[in-house]
Amino acid sequence: MKTMGITGGNGFIASLVKEAMQSTMEIIPLTRKELDLGETAAVRSWFNTHDYDYVFHTGAMAQTADCENHPELTHRINVDGTKEIAKACKEKNARLIFISTEQCFNGKTEEGPFTEDTPLCSVTAYGNHKAECEAFITSVLEDYIILRFSWMLGMSRPGIKASPNIIRNVMNAMFYQTPAKFTVNEIRGMTYAQKLADVFDKIIELPSGIYHVSDTNTHNTYESANIVAQKLGFTQEQIDACILPNHERYADRFRDYRLDTQKLKAHGIDFGTFEENVDACLKDFGWLK
């Protein structure tokens, strides 16, 4: 049985993938307790002294504010730690599966969707961290998978805590009758994370390269929030009272983060439309029949 180490081992994506893969692969989940990615010497030591066939590197400090306010710490975790893992994978002849992000394109002024070959342009520290990691991985390794994620959605359940996402945000607004604003100046993919976990066995065997993981979405974030609320059964009057358009955020420049996914589709992996992803999530958790 092959072995896969997973950094960020108790995170949302890591937990789903561990659950999906643990019957066919030995999984070594590495949480911050076992390995602090900010301690480069410890990262180097662990990956040089353990055996593994794959590393799924999900661990990172992904909050934009943290990256902007603590540039040295977050660079050490997000970039320096990744470089140590990549170098170890080369020595061990192990395949690195690295999570990157749509935020590598957040400085683009043209419309998406963007392909894997589109030049990167980020205006945030987090996006630049991921771009720097991508450049290092592609220059050092021959055997790697870089997955640029859209915004991943889902819901929490015992043992797995979902990351903040549009479904949770809409539910909080509607069920607690707490009005929330959603920007009209942004369009992005929003993909049900379980769909990724369900095909992860295929993803880790893809040819080496960069791949975009995203649904297809033609709605801005405010429109997307409306769709979620409608699927939850609320009337438009109820929705209009709690799902509010935010015209101020990104008023300087419309953000288009959409990712072109034709490359993955050519390998038989298709994450479908935004509506299909929301339906799948709500059905899995009993909110839709």
What are the functions of these language-model segments?
Residues K2-M21:
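N-terminal Rossmann NAD(P)H-binding glycine-rich loop of SDR-like oxidoreductase domains
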Residues E26-S45:
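Adenosine-cofactor binding site in Rossmann-like domains, unifying the SAM/SAH pocket
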Residues T40-I77, A88-K90:
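NAD(P)H-binding glycine-rich loop region in Rossmannoid oxidoreductase-like domains
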Residues R76, G81-E84, C104-L147, M152-L153, ...:
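Catalytic helix-loop patch of NAD(P)-dependent Rossmann-fold dehydrogenases
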Residues T138-R188:
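NAD(P)-dependent short-chain dehydrogenase/reductase
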Residues I167-A180, E186-D215:
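Alpha-helical substrate-binding/gating segment
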Residues V199, I203-Y250, K289:
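Mid/C-terminal beta-alpha module of Rossmann-like enzyme folds, strongest
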Residues N220-N226, I243-C281, F285-K289:
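Conserved C-terminal active-site "lid" loop/helix of NAD(P)H-dependent oxidoreductases
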